[in-house]
Amino acid sequence: MQSSLHALPVLQDNVLWIWVRGDEAAVVDPAVAEPVIDWLQQRQLQLSAVLQTHHHADHIGGTPGLLERWPDAAVVAAGADRSRIPFQTISVSDGDQVTVLGRSLQVLDVAAHTSAHIAFVIPEQEDPDLGPVVFCGDTLFSGGCGRLFEGTPADMHRALRRLSELPESTKVCCAHEYTEGNLLWAIQQQPQDAAIRQRYDAVVDLRRRGELSLPSSIGEERRSNLFMRAASAEELGRLRRHKDHWRAA
């Protein structure tokens, strides 16, 4: 049974991920329901599971609507966030394995953006059609990282270190298309960095053609993401504070 992975842009910059195996699908962080329902119905697919990385409205807002259409779909979320994701049916925590679409996913605690943020990893051996994949929500972005709404620079540094330990080929399926802005900011911090400049130019070309820059890869983030390259929590904190107040010209 072959698998495929699809990115579905919604709202201003959200990206939903839809993982398909056979005639079933799982969706990650559905901000809204209708585009997902339309996408699945056009392909005659059944929704088997919803994966929630954290509780923010632009990640869980569509789940109740999906459950109205597919009431038997599982909702996998952090047990520590039950009060904020009350419709979860499978509660998980760091180190857990959870079966989705017949495959075993690993759960990682990557709390920083929020206090109970998790990521889901599909190891390559579990689904060779996809290769290794991480659904990382708003912790790791392509070329950046999430704002620290409920965590500290030390929390984010720890979370990014955990993600950086995944295989280089791991697809980074984050939840927003922020790459161009993230890399423009990074160039201004490191104007002589060839890896960042080359990646930025490639992303600008993609976006001008109307294409997504996602997914990235762990290897690419190691090379050209200043937050993932930060040697300490203090350095990451300085970068994050600067980025929080930065606006593109």
Swiss-Prot record:
InterPro entries assigned to the protein according to its UniProt record, in alphabetical order: Clx_II_MBL (IPR035680), Glyoxalase_II_hydrolase (IPR050110), HAGH_C (IPR032282), Hydroxyacylglutathione_Hdrlase (IPR017782), Metallo-B-lactamas (IPR001279), RibonucZ/Hydroxyglut_hydro (IPR036866)
Cofactor-binding details, from the entry: Binds 2 Zn(2+) ions per subunit.
Entry's Gene Ontology molecular function annotations: hydroxyacylglutathione hydrolase activity; metal ion binding
One Pfam family cited in the UniProt record for this chain: HAGH_C
Positions with a binding annotation for Zn(2+) 2: 58-59, 138, 176
Disulfide bridge positions per record: none
UniProt keywords, alphabetically: Hydrolase, Metal-binding, Zinc
Enzyme class: hydrolase
Pathway: Secondary metabolite metabolism; methylglyoxal degradation; (R)-lactate from methylglyoxal: step 2/2
EC number: 3.1.2.6
Keyword Hydrolase included in the entry's annotation: yes
Catalyzed chemical reaction(s): an S-(2-hydroxyacyl)glutathione + H2O = a 2-hydroxy carboxylate + glutathione + H(+)
Highest rank taxon of the organism: Bacteria
Role according to the record: Thiolesterase that catalyzes the hydrolysis of S-D-lactoyl-glutathione to form glutathione and D-lactic acid.
Complex and partners: Monomer.
Family, as annotated: Belongs to the metallo-beta-lactamase superfamily. Glyoxalase II family.
Name of this protein: Hydroxyacylglutathione hydrolase
Species assigned in the record: Parasynechococcus marenigrum (strain WH8102)
Gene: gloB
